[in-house]
Amino acid sequence: MARYIGPKAKLSRREGTDLFLKSARRSLADKCKLDSKPGQHGRTSGARTSDYGTQLREKQKVKRIYGVLERQFRRYFAEADRRKGNTGENLLKLLESRLDNVVYRMGFGSTRAEARQLVSHKAITVNGVVANIPSLQVKAGDVIAVREQAKKQARILEALSLAEQGGLPQWVAVDSKKFEGTFKSMPERSDIAGDINESLIVELYSR
């Protein structure tokens, strides 16, 4: 399955909630009707969604939020299930500790897609070493930084400004003047914002 490159707002409308796929410069709710499905007049149906359909939609929503394809998502779930603790929470923690997501959470990219591009274009270092794999798992204590030649990019400066206005997660510490941040610890479930019901995904894969 190829990565989706179409309109980001369409995906949020499909899920009926803002997936934060676009910059926070303007609220997505101001741009489109999130309660209206994609299509000229919005797709309507009187049929009740089945339990399976609800579970599948939740999985699709989380995949789209983090920009992960099906095969990779299955691997994340298998690893989450293998680890001790709550499988659903483990899954979200694995997704949150992806390098592209951490770059986004630190405010170096205004969206996860932009953060993923920064990583792919070798604009990011981890502990002083260039890292260009978006799915790299970041560990507690790792230092993430913007490379010197990328510090003047307008999109990074703008993203940092937006992040400072909106606030940063407690599990990262960022020095915006140095363009670097520290992944202090794995986030707790309560630290992960967003309208996500991970238990539905666990139920889906438990069928």
From Swiss-Prot:
InterPro entries: Ribosomal_uS4, Ribosomal_uS4_bac-type, Ribosomal_uS4_CS, Ribosomal_uS4_N, S4_RNA-bd, S4_RNA-bd_sf. GO terms for biological process: ribosomal small subunit biogenesis; translation. Gene3D superfamilies: Ribosomal Protein S4 Delta 41, Chain A, domain 1, RNA-binding S4 domain. Residues 31-55 are annotated as: Disordered. GO terms for molecular function: rRNA binding; structural constituent of ribosome. Residues 97-160 form the S4 RNA-binding domain. Keywords: Ribonucleoprotein, Ribosomal protein, RNA-binding, rRNA-binding. CDD domains: S4 (cd00165). One of its GO terms (cellular component) is small ribosomal subunit. The keyword Transferase does not apply. Pfam families: Ribosomal_S4, S4. SMART domains: Ribosomal_S4, S4. Residues 42-53 have a biased composition (Polar residues). Belongs to the universal ribosomal protein uS4 family. HAMAP family: Ribosomal_uS4_B (MF_01306_B). Part of the 30S ribosomal subunit. Contacts protein S5. The interaction surface between S4 and S5 is involved in control of translational fidelity. One of the primary rRNA binding proteins, it binds directly to 16S rRNA where it nucleates assembly of the body of the 30S subunit. This is Small ribosomal subunit protein uS4. It comes from Paraburkholderia phymatum (strain DSM 17167 / CIP 108236 / LMG 21445 / STM815). The gene is rpsD.
